[in-house]
Design a protein with these regions (language model features):
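Alpha-helical transmembrane cores and adjacent cytosolic helix/loop segments
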Residues: 1-239
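Peripheral (non-transmembrane) domains and long loops of multi-pass membrane proteins
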Residues: 1-27, 77, 219-325
Length: 325
């Protein structure tokens, strides 16, 4: 058994094992690609505030990949007495760290952009000698931004967005979503640079503000999603748009058991895997341990994401439990 095939006590199916290996490769590729991008932009950043903001955004975009790869080291570990539920929350913590970092730096950049606009800072973009020719540095800035956008928009962004639902990984989904939207930063930075070139100085600051607001929005979304998941909200899909359908499947399965009259479930997302608390109202007064064990095994077989299952016979279903309707 390979380490990529184990999440806590859950052994991943072949599809998920392949997906996690691909995700790791894409995250490593993204780090290398973005590092090269950061170095190239540093050579041409000049005094353009829009370019500086785009440059910083590229640095921030490394956080989700580092958080994902770091969290992956923890979620593979089996539960212990010290951590009886395993370390699956590490993925949610990584998601939260990424969101807070984006939000904090985005706010700082937005304040800087607004301050520059209010004070009327006029950025200047000079010329450079290249192959014996004098070239306006702005053209190099535009060329660099056009080239570097190819990776996130056309390659690793779409690739990660296909892997995120397979792995039920919200951090990977957020990473892919930000990468696919990177074209907005590119367009804004190009507009800011060209604005300086034609004498509209405030376009540079406005572009920097636009990019900053995008960073703030990414930070807010990721922070909000991570916090509500860590606070054990009702388990939702990888994109957080809908309640996860597995809850309904579990309730339907339990109701199909001949000894179960009614059933409901509380399901929380541990970070890629679920902890299940199922409540059943038996048709008869006594329930055997065999019945409970067989039902728990059946629930586990429904989906690879089922990590822990607890089934409690009750006289009345809890109001907060999901009846699957």
């Amino acid at each position: 058994m390979t380490t990529t095939g184990q999440f806590g006590r859950t052994t991943l199916p072949d599809e998920q094992q392949q997906a996690i290996r691909k995700a790791v490769r894409w995250e490593v590729f993204t780090i290398v690609y973005t590092s090269v991008t950061i170095a190239v932009i540093a050579l041409v950043v000049g005094e353009s505030q829009a370019m500086r903001t785009a440059w910083i955004e590229d640095m921030l975009s490394l956080i989700p990949q580092v958080a994902f790869l770091t969290a992956l080291l923890f979620v593979r570990r089996r539960p212990t007495r010290k951590h009886p539920y395993g370390l699956h929350r590490a993925m949610g913590v990584g998601h939260l760290v990424a969101g807070v970092a984006l939000l904090a730096v985005g706010l700082n950049l937005a304040i800087e952009a607004v301050t520059g606009l209010i004070s009327g800072e006029h950025p200047t973009i000079g010329t450079v000698q290249l192959f014996g020719q004098t070239i306006w540095l702005g053209w190099l800035m535009v060329a660099v931004m056009v080239v570097v956008i190819v990776g996130p928009v056309f390659f690793y962004g779409p690739a990660k967005s296909k892997l995120a639902p397979v792995l039920h990984n919200k951090l990977l989904y957020a990473d892919a979503d930000m990468a696919k939207a990177d074209w907005q930063t590119t367009v804004a930075s190009i507009v800011g640079v060209l604005g300086v070139g034609i004498g509209i100085w405030w376009l540079d600051g406005a572009a920097a503000l636009f990019i900053s607001l995008g960073i703030i929005w990414d930070g807010f979304r990721n922070t909000r999603t991570a916090i509500v998941d860590l606070m054990d909200q009702r388990a939702r899909t990888y994109d957080s748009k809908n309640p996860h359908p597995l809850a309904g499947d579990i309730v339907s399965y339990l109701r199909s058991r001949p000894w179960v009259a009614e059933a409901a479930v509380r399901m929380r997302d541990q970070g890629q895997v679920f902890h299940i608390e199922a409540f059943v109202v038996p048709r008869r007064g006594k329930v055997t341990t065999h019945d409970l064990s067989a039902a728990a095994a059946g629930i586990t077989d429904l989906d690879w994401k089922v990590q822990d299952v607890v089934i409690a016979p009750v006289e009345k279903l809890p109001d907060e439990a999901d009846p699957g309707r």
